[in-house]
Design a protein with these regions (language model features):
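Extracytoplasmic/luminal low-complexity segments enriched in Pro/Gly and acidic/polar residues
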Residues: 201-275
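Beta-strand elements of well-folded, non-transmembrane domains
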Residues: 69-71, 90-92, 118-120, 138-140, ...
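N-terminal beta-strand/beta-hairpin edge segment
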Residues: 57-144, 148-170, 182
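Short amphipathic alpha-helical segments
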Residues: 36-43, 143, 219-228
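Short helix-loop boundary/capping segments
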Residues: 169-219
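Hydrophobic membrane-targeting and insertion signals
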Residues: 1-78, 93, 267-275
Length: 275
């Protein structure tokens, strides 16, 4: 009887062995999935950091990367991910946006939420997506600085002597967002003039409608329009190269634009080139 018991113990439980093997394999797959997600996230973050630093920007935060429920391990065989979501941090450094002591300086990129669909990860540091949606956040100071730089560079070319004289002295000093009205109230030279700027999507791009505006009591539609175009469409055009503008809205911090692109490399999303 004892011998029979011993033989039973030696035989063990085949089902238990199978379950154990399955659990080990599942654990290995889970660990591998986590490790691969971390690796890809680091590659993308490092690529973003290198691109920004090469232009002199300071990167204090990593890119936040999410792959959702898409199995990343499968991408090792197919070199393609179903989708990816990124949150790129702002690296903007804006010096003297109101041009009080000379020309403003702009370095870096604004923050953005990026959604990539059907991503080719053959090059892990610079994936290419068949479709990309970018929601970029443009702070008021960025638009103010860009307007003052652009109008200063163009001074003297309007063909209107009065406008050229005024534009050489006038600076955009404030942009106050009014999300409820969908406008940005522009203030020039500390209150010398004001005008409401309404950003709109037009023909796949961004345009601005100017509502009111005078300088020293004299209508100066051309001057106001030059500042408005530079403030609203300038930064958006630089971000949106290769994209179609799908939406624009005034936010508490300035303006947000939604861009849509096809067959876009991640490196083309991460940065704005400035002077």
């Amino acid at each position: 009887m004892n011998a029979k018991r011993k033989r039973t113990k030696k035989r063990g439980n085949p089902l238990g062995v199978i379950v154990g093997v399955v659990l080990v394999v599942a654990l290995v797959l889970v660990v591998g999935e986590i490790a691969l997600r971390m690796f890809l996230g680091k590659e993308i973050s490092d690529g973003f950091r290198e691109a920004e630093q090469s232009r002199g920007a300071v990167v204090s935060e990593d890119v936040q990367t999410s792959f959702g429920s898409n199995p990343v391990l499968l991408a090792l065989l197919t070199s393609e991910l179903g989708g990816m979501n990124l949150r790129t941090p702002s690296t903007l450094q804006i010096t003297d946006p109101r041009a009080e002591n000379g020309a403003p300086q702009i370095i870096g990129s604004p923050a953005a939420d990026v959604t990539l669909t059907d991503v080719d990860i053959s090059n892990t540091s610079d994936p290419v997506a068949s479709r990309v949606e970018v929601v970029a956040e443009l702070p008021s100071d960025l638009m103010i600085a860009d307007a003052n730089i652009s109008v200063s560079d163009a001074t003297g070319g309007s063909g209107n002597i009065f406008e050229d004289l005024v534009s050489s002295a006038v600076r955009l000093t404030a942009l106050t967002p009014h999300p409820d009205r969908g406008v940005l109230t522009a203030e020039f030279s500390g209150g010398l003039a004001t005008a409401d700027l309404r950003p709109v999507v037009r023909d796949g791009g961004i345009a601005v409608e100017v509502e009111g505006g005078s300088v020293l009591g004299v209508q100066a539609d051309g001057l106001i329009s030059r500042f408005a175009d530079a403030a609203v469409t300038g930064p958006a055009q630089q971000i949106g190269h290769g994209f179609t503008v799908a939406g624009v809205e005034v936010t508490d911090g300035g303006m947000a634009i939604t861009l849509d692109g096809r067959d876009i490399a991640l490196s083309s999303v991460s940065a704005i080139e400035y002077r």
